Amino acid sequence: MKNMNKKSIIFGLMLLLGTSIFAQAIKFSAKDIDGKNVSEKVFADSKITMVNVWGTFCGPCIREMPDLGVLNKKYGDDFQIVGIVIDTVNSKGLVNAKTVNSAKNIVKTTGADYLHIIPDSSLLNGVLSEVYAVPTTFFVDSSGRIVGKVYTGSRTLKQWQEIVESFLQTR
């Protein structure tokens, strides 16, 4: 009986992990902070995309953004960064124009001149429903699937370079 319970628990955990939001390809149709349409097709532009979920209220997020701007330019077509500004919408999915303007100013000030997305309901109810702190960063392959681990908290430029280079070497 004990062995049967263990098998049931292990099977249940495997089932849960296999159906995790992070195991599925990301699909969305949203706008960037400049109002342009953007979808999951953006991931096809590079071998690997670093997705950085951040907030305008988050000091560590903003402090790492200059380094992310440098990182975005370093690896050419093989790599890109996409930011998702988590606090530009409320819990009902309504866009907060004041926060979007704040995000634009932060991007300009920090030199983080990569794509920054206002999350739509499919992002909020999908991959972002498992984000509990910012910054949270994960990597997506060209087909839109999350690869590797999820990173919570900011990192230095050197730390991010090591992580990105390990992804690029395996792709």
Pin down the residues of each PLM region.
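Sec/Tat signal peptide C-region and signal peptidase I cleavage site
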Residues: 19-23
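Short pre-active-site segment immediately N-terminal to redox-active cysteine/selenocysteine motifs
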Residues: 47-49, 53-57, 88, 133
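Thiol-based oxidoreductase modules, predominantly thioredoxin-like and allied folds used
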Residues: 79-97, 112-121
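A short beta-strand-turn-helix
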Residues: 29-49, 73
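Conserved redox-active cysteine motifs that mediate thiol-disulfide chemistry
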Residues: 53-70
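Short, internal strand/loop/helix patches
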Residues: 99-140
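Sec-dependent N-terminal signal peptides
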Residues: 7-17
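Thiol-/selenol-based redox modules, centered on thioredoxin-like
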Residues: 139-171
